[in-house]
């Protein structure tokens, strides 16, 4: 019986250790995600005019996947040194027109 209790205690300790490791990994992943997000915000703040930044944040509320794609593309271009001046609201509108999928126009013809 003592052997079974020891075995149970070892299992319990091992399970607790695994749980601690998993929690630590989750905390590290969350911290890494926060750092990446902070870097993205800093880069976008540096390359976007306030009006363009506001438009992008509104777009993020309505269409997060499109906003994320545009943000990633802008960050990539900035890191590659391909953006020479701040992006204005007008420039961002043009970028968004190119990125958004074309809508099919449905025409109804009545006879």
From Swiss-Prot:
An example Gene Ontology molecular-function term: DNA binding
GO cellular component terms, A-Z: cytosol
Entry keyword set: DNA-binding
A Pfam family the protein falls into: dsDNA_bind
Family: Belongs to the PDCD5 family.
Identification of the protein by name: DNA-binding protein AF_2068
Native source species: Archaeoglobus fulgidus (strain ATCC 49558 / DSM 4304 / JCM 9628 / NBRC 100126 / VC-16)
Lineage start: Archaea, Methanobacteriati, Methanobacteriota, Archaeoglobi, Archaeoglobales
């Amino acid at each position: 019986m003592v052997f079974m209790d020891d075995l149970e205690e070892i299992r319990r300790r091992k399970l607790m250790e695994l749980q601690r490791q998993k929690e630590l990994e989750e905390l590290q992943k969350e911290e890494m995600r926060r750092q990446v997000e902070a870097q993205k915000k800093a880069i976008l703040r540096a390359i976007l005019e306030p009006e363009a930044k506001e438009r992008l944040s509104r777009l993020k509320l309505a269409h997060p996947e499109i906003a994320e794609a545009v943000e990633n593309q802008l960050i990539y271009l900035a890191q590659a040194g391909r953006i020479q001046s701040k992006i204005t609201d007008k420039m961002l509108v043009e970028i968004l027109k190119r990125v958004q999928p074309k809508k099919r126009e449905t025409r109804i013809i009545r006879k």
